[in-house]
């Protein structure tokens, strides 16, 4: 089963290991971790991640996010830090302000990134492929949108079923609840009247990721064809697959 790392000063830290593929294989633990921002990590939490095997951190946040909340591994002498501004510095809120169904809104945003930020998606995947000997952690702010998009590509490379990938995506609803109530919830929204299932429905429904995969399959034939089309080499694809499946 996938592993959640319960750190007191970081949200949504999860291992991509433990998922069955369509051929009956299981993705390996301690290869790729996905998470939210790491700027509040204590020395103890940093040590826990290093003990888990983390040797590379890939930060997918926007420039202003990195400047406002620098990653604690930015100046580490033991962990390599890579910043890739995956989505550019446009306002994410513009997508949400359009209103409408959450799955439509969120999937439209992800598809926009996948179609309009191809060089940066490629850069992220190539960086992940280059750091496969140990554990690599990739993160954004909440570990849901940018990270969820990249995680879906990694799992697709390993032939994990689309339904499972969508389920992995929705788990952010479970592990972002504390942040939601700490930082985002209106005063009248409480744990008593708003559960993680409600959050999941409002912010990360499975249907959103299913729509993304439907788009890529319709436009490119397969997810792997999309990955190849943006210039990710066969060697990099093989490295990712080997890391997660052995």
Question: Where do the protein language model's features map onto the residues?
Answer:
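Cys-dependent protein tyrosine phosphatase-like superfamily
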Residues: 1-137, 150-246
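Ser/Thr-glycine-rich phosphate-binding loops at phosphate-binding pockets of nucleotides
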Residues: 142, 146-147
């Amino acid at each position: 089963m996938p592993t959640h790392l319960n750190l007191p000063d970081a949200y949504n830290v999860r291992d991509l290991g433990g998922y069955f593929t369509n051929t009956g294989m299981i993705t390996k633990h301690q290869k790729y971790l996905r998470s939210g921002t790491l700027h509040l990590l204590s020395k103890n939490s940093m040590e826990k991640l290093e003990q888990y095997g983390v040797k590379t951190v890939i930060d997918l946040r926007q420039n202003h996010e990195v400047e406002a909340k620098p990653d604690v591994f930015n100046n580490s002498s033991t962990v390599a830090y890579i910043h890739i501004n995956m989505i550019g510095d446009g306002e994410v809120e513009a997508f949400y302000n359009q209103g409408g169904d959450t799955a439509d809104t969120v999937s439209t945003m992800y598809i926009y990134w996948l179609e309009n930020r191809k060089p940066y998606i490629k850069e992220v995947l190539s960086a992940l492929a280059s750091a496969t000997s140990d554990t690599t952690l990739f993160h954004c702010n909440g570990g849901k949108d940018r990270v969820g998009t990249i995680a879906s590509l990694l799992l697709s490379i390993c032939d994990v079923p689309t339904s499972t990938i969508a389920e992995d995506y929705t788990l952010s609803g479970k592990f972002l609840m504390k942040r939601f109530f700490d930082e985002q919830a209106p005063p009248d929204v409480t744990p008593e009247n708003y559960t993680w299932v409600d959050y999941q429905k409002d912010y990360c429904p499975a249907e959103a990721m299913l729509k993304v995969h439907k788009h890529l399959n319709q436009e490119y034939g397969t997810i792997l064809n999309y990955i190849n089309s943006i210039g990710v080499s066969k060697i990099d694809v093989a490295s990712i697959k080997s890391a997660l499946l052995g």
